[in-house]
Amino acid sequence: MVLFTDLQSQNGGHCQPLLYLKSIPVAQFELGTFDYLNTLIASHAIPCDWKVVGGVHPIKTRALLIAVKERLQRIATRDPALAAKVQILESHEELKQLRVEGAMGAIYQPNAAKCWPYKLVAWILERLVRDDARAATGEKLFNLQTSTSALGLQRLEDGYWIVHTSRGQITTKQVLLATNAYTSYLLPRMTGLIVPVRGQVSALVTPDKGEQLQHSYAWLDNEGGEDYLIHRDNGPLILGGERLVADGAEVGVSRDDAVDAAVAESLRRALYGTLKLKEPDQEEDDELAADFEWTGIMGYSKDDSPWVGAVPESLGGGGGLWISAGYTGHGMPVAARTGISVAQMMMGREKQEGAVAVPEEYKISETRIRNLEGKAERTLVEELKMLDRP
């Protein structure tokens, strides 16, 4: 088996299931992935700064607040335990305690964590290399090839695949594409189904007399914008988002070797008037200094759901080609278990007891592909109203 992956560096270390913004099966899957990561990291003492802190979603408008309340009522009728994991806070004292006094209200979810994603991935890769070297048989099963570009795929008549790379060719029965934003380079027929979108993150210097934030934050607006924030313990504020201020909102941008100046400035100013960083009697800074600014390329799915499973011939696949990609900037509470699920499919173990089943929305089908033709964009309020409707 050959795995090709896009390890993108934009990730800001914000892991939180969107329990009220997804269908119930998807919310349950994301919560399961969060619990899986929490257990994995704790059981192996993985040094990746993982800390469960609870997540706050400030709500800016009355219309969005009403839509969220109605959505939670519908969830409660079908899955009361899931609905109980989401709290709506509206009182001035509650919002002040969360440092978002100017908000119309706020969502609080205890199931949210911050971490250093690179450290987590590096630990896993190091463990795979180490365990492979210690294998009793002496046979190497894991081969890590970094800085090796996949240039093309070729299917042979006997069912094998040839992967053309910058270092030669590989012939294999099965290929897994974890290529996310760059999927259409190898599968041109998926152009438009997964689109590259550049995200930008800043490590902002905690201001003088700034206090340690106790929670992570995410701001979602009706126009499709999303900002997300974690505060490293005794370190910088890691803020990502603000891409809507860039020309074209960074949609279709696949280069991560530059930062957008307008986005960078907006990130430095974004928290002013939005989040209280200092002690109550201290005046806030209208702009923060940035120690580091960087970008990474996200894979946005046309219907906001990942693509997981066997790639059909209509998309350039056939027997032996698999995919897990298209996380729409929300891979942290998703990708770990979609990866497990597709690996089980490849080994024919998807029906065994304990196998990880992905939601129907993630599965690849001709019906899903057809339904995306001419799909209209929806606002966040419209999306909330549509979820779980009969």
Task: Give residue ranges: language-model regions.
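Active-site lid/adjacent beta-loop-alpha segment flanking the redox-cofactor pocket in flavoenzymes
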Residues: 189, 193, 210-320
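General small-molecule cofactor/ligand-binding pocket signal
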Residues: 85-90, 143-145, 289-293
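N-terminal Rossmann-like FAD-binding beta1-loop-alpha1 element of flavoenzymes
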Residues: 1
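Rossmann-like flavin
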Residues: 22-127
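C-terminal lid/capping helical subdomain adjacent to the catalytic/cofactor pocket in oxidative enzymes
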Residues: 148, 157, 161, 304-307, ...
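Glycine-rich active-site loop/strand segments that organize a redox cofactor
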Residues: 4-29
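Helical element adjacent to the flavin cofactor pocket in flavoenzyme catalytic cores
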Residues: 74, 78, 100-173
